[in-house]
Amino acid sequence: MIVPFGHVLLLAGALFGLGVFCAVARRNLIMIVLGVEIMLNAASIAFIGAAARWQSMEGQAFVLFILAVAATEVSIGLAIIVYAFRRTGSFDPAAYNLMKAGDAMQSFERRGPQ
């Protein structure tokens, strides 16, 4: 039995909406990264469904590209999260001012040029 294309798009849209909610409504960096991953998987489902609908291989090629991007995003994102957690002790994004220019300049002024 073949699943209708509309059902595949409905599933992909529901997953994408869940991912957006998870990424926007949560106050935890790990949940934000998880939401982005859910959105990427929803896009993959839509591409696979479209490829099956029109019997083309471009959908599978896009999914391989999405998987590579997702793996890279997870590895870099988790490395940044681990670094930020070690520095602040919190997963709350509001606690992170790591890229604030004023702090870097004050630190430079205290130490002086090297």
Curated annotation (Swiss-Prot):
It is a multi-pass membrane protein. Its main location: membrane. One of its GO terms (biological process) is ATP synthesis coupled electron transport. Pfam families: Oxidored_q2. Gene3D superfamilies: 1.10.287.3510. It is found in: Cell inner membrane. The chain crosses the membrane at residues 1-21, 29-49, 62-82. The keyword Transmembrane applies. It catalyses: a quinone + NADH + 5 H(+)(in) = a quinol + NAD(+) + 4 H(+)(out). GO terms for molecular function: NADH:ubiquinone reductase (non-electrogenic) activity; quinone binding. Its EC number is 7.1.1.-. The keyword Translocase applies. Coiled coil: none annotated. GO terms for cellular component: NADH dehydrogenase complex; plasma membrane. Signal peptide: none annotated. Keywords: Cell inner membrane, Cell membrane, Membrane, NAD, Quinone, Translocase, Transmembrane, Transmembrane helix, Transport, Ubiquinone. InterPro entries: NADH_UbQ_OxRdtase_chain4L/K, NUOK/Mnh_C1-like. NDH-1 is composed of 14 different subunits. Subunits NuoA, H, J, K, L, M, N constitute the membrane sector of the complex. NDH-1 shuttles electrons from NADH, via FMN and iron-sulfur (Fe-S) centers, to quinones in the respiratory chain. The immediate electron acceptor for the enzyme in this species is believed to be ubiquinone. Couples the redox reaction to proton translocation (for every two electrons transferred, four hydrogen ions are translocated across the cytoplasmic membrane), and thus conserves the redox energy in a proton gradient. Belongs to the complex I subunit 4L family. This is NADH-quinone oxidoreductase subunit K 2. It comes from Syntrophobacter fumaroxidans (strain DSM 10017 / MPOB). The lineage of its organism: Bacteria, Pseudomonadati, Thermodesulfobacteriota, Syntrophobacteria, Syntrophobacterales.
